[in-house]
Amino acid sequence: MFNKLKTLFRTRTPPPRIVQARFDAAQTSKDNARHWAAADHLSADMEAAPEVRRTLRMRSRYEVANNSYAKGLVQMLANDTIGTGPRLQMLSGDEDFNDEVESEFMRWADAVKLASKLRTMRMSRCQDGEAFAVLATNPKIKNPVKLDLMLIEADRVSGDLKWLEDDTSVDGISFDQWGNPVDYRVLKYHPGDVHYMPGDEAIHVPAEYMLHIFRQDRPGLHRGVPELTAALPLFAQLRRYNLAVLSAAEAAADFAAVLYTDAPANGESDEVEPMDTIPLERNMMLTVPAGWKMGQLDPKQPAANHSEFVKIILSEIARCVVTTYGTLAGDFSGHNYASGRLDNQIYHKSILVDRSFWETEVLNRIFEVWFREYTLATMKNVLTERHLWFWDGAESVDPAKTATAQEKRLANNTTTLAAECAKDGRDYMSVLRQRAKEYKLMRELGIPVAGKEKNIQPEPDDGSEPKEEMDE
């Protein structure tokens, strides 16, 4: 009985509390409503609609053409990514075959100006958002292989008015049911060309002969937007600020001096003609009317903060292409050795990633078609072998320290000569062959070889100290 009463009047356990959590960024208030007003729920392709990409391309090209920082940024990316051009290294077991293919590919690349065209494609990808190149036959190529790269601007790859109703195409690119590109619709003339007429017939290029590169920032994106998109307003702000500072300085400099008086109206000061101008001469004494003072205009412009503002804007611009202020501006005056190397490491890491993209999407496809044409031209039935691509190496900030570190890695077997040469964009086999030729010639000419090991005498049995053999 007592237990029943105890259970009846015991303290009940309160119900569990439900935690109500939310994301602050998902809330809309009067303070942030205007900031998030332009946020949308469009798909990747609709967000990058043809009209949007056309506007972005025009503004990006305008800014690159009129802004030295934007122009330098685009050229810097092309020069650092492509450089003097990639170099082929074959990995088959036949060294003679490797040398022959590498030499022939180099001759063909020089004939078609491959490095220059790749740099143009890199600039177009940054400025226009995407680049196109057709693998076509050019009978004027001075090489047994008549393959050529014909560059096409993004404006020419365009769909007709029915592409919105066709779920298998996106603005000039047709896809199969698995999402693979099948066909590219290329206009005969650029839409801004004098020969262009709306409704002209377009050229359809099979996907296997078309190179299309762009940065896919969202799944489902099939056409690229300029890499400078996020920085375009910043470039405009920087140019406007520079013009404002210059205008203020010019306005203040236009007036060498002004006359003003503290006397009241109709006071004792001499009368002067308002807005009258007086020519001034250098190193001359000047008298002013009684009651008047001479002064100069103060521009009231924060010129002292101008350089800091430019640095902040350029630092923000640099991040859209994964670089830093020092690299973009070419100004390392505030850096020491360590910070300068750190800046370059961040930038060169992105260059390595981008080069991997170029190898997969561009170079391997070019080599595949070239090798097929090469075997047909030389009447050789050879299967495609494994290969690598060498790029230009990055210049060292301190060559002496870099060479010392390289020597230590080779001495303790934590690296290989092939890996070290690859960092400089060189083939270790070519380096060794060239060094062997140089050593042979130096011995023939009687020139001492630097770093040659000295012959060491065996340790004598009588316990005396061994004598060093003197070089002749």
Functional labels for PLM-detected ranges:
Residues 1-86, 468-472:
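N-terminal-proximal low-complexity accessory segments that begin disordered
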Residues 2-12, 341-342, 361-371, 375-389, ...:
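C-terminal anchoring/interaction modules
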Residues 61-216, 409:
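Structured, mid-chain assembly/scaffold modules that mediate subunit interfaces
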Residues 88, 92-103, 286-401:
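Surface-exposed loop-to-helix/strand elements on domain peripheries
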Residues 121-122, 136, 248-254, 328-332, ...:
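Short coil/turn segments at secondary-structure boundaries
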Residues 179, 317, 420:
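Acidic/polar, glycine-anchored loop/turn motif associated with catalytic or activation segments
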Residues 185-190, 325-326, 426-433:
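Short amphipathic alpha-helical segments with coiled-coil-like heptad repeat character
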Residues 209-342, 387, 458-462:
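Extended, charged amphipathic alpha-helical segments
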